[in-house]
Amino acid sequence: MKKTLLLALALFATIGLYAQQPGRPQLPKAMTEYEKGTKPSETNRLRQEYPRIDPQTRKAYFKFYLPLAHSVTVSVPNDFKGTKDIDGVWTIETDPLPVGFHYYFVTVDGARLTDPNTYAYYGYGLTAGGIEVPEGPEGNYYRFNKDVPHGQVRSLNYYSKTNGTYRHINVYVPASYETGKKRYPVLYLLHGSGENEEGWIDQGHVDFILDNMIAAGEAQEMIVVVMSGDMRYTPDIRDVPGKTVSDIYVDDLVPFIDKTFRTIPNRENRAMAGLSRGGGQTTSTVLDNHNMDKFAWMGLLSGLFRVTDENVKTVFGGAFADPATFNKQIRLLHISWGSDEGNFGFPASCAAVQKQGINCVTFVSEGTAHEWLTWRRSFRDFAKRLFKK
């Protein structure tokens, strides 16, 4: 197995480089015979032609020059087996794929690898390839628009006393941040399980979404802190009994952001939201840990949210027991999901809190599942309601 893995890695090291170097032999002709009507995926690295997408059929095409390989499979996430020509070029054609972003892996002779032709993305707890099956003009809200002002995404580290180590965040500031002394509300935004704080930028395009919405007058200017939902546990890093990531956010991160950026440092101008597990961490931080005095806006994007008629008065530390108090403290409870997500129980849970008298706004992304296109659409609906006076 070790020999197979080393061989696969050596072969993959040539992909995308072999034909680019002056004086090197050219790759077989099949590598430059592109399928009619296809275009390179927007997630491809510079000068890489594969994977390619047919916008009409939504099929994806992959080619690899791996003459010594015996089998090549691409998983998107279903498995598609490749065929090999006499020159050693493997071609893989998928079935029609749903629009939106998808992680994928390449398996060469049993060794699962990340395709070096695309940028690397963190998903399923692993580094994966990524492919974007494009929407039509309806997807322009999350695309880069050269005609609108653009904010910045800043990469920072901060020290967590709670965890005894540094932690990484990405911070979006709107285009106007550098031009004046204005102060801004802050959204703290979480990823889901198996992903990290890069996801909302690289896969979700939250910066492009806000650039476009702010320019169109559809969203308030805001700072967005994209943070990690995980804690580090090693012999050299402090594991404080009873402490969670919620304590890190409240005790370490919020003070750091208020000190570092021009924020409006009060609950009325502070929000928290997250997708999937990050939605559960949002309810845990704001409701279970009784931090409604620090956050007034909440967004759960396919977030863990299990509420029934029987437990509505006791769940989340009894946060819903007094609807009048809750509605006064939480300016927005926004719950969203994809229509094809399966039995997560979102409609029933929302109905239970609404029956209790809790103000709850819902949004359903039609035709999407537990995926980034759902969360892009959901974030857009959430953002247009956020920090409205």
PLM regions: where:
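Non-catalytic cap/lid and distal C-terminal segments of serine-dependent acyl enzymes
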Residues: P22-F80, K84-K389
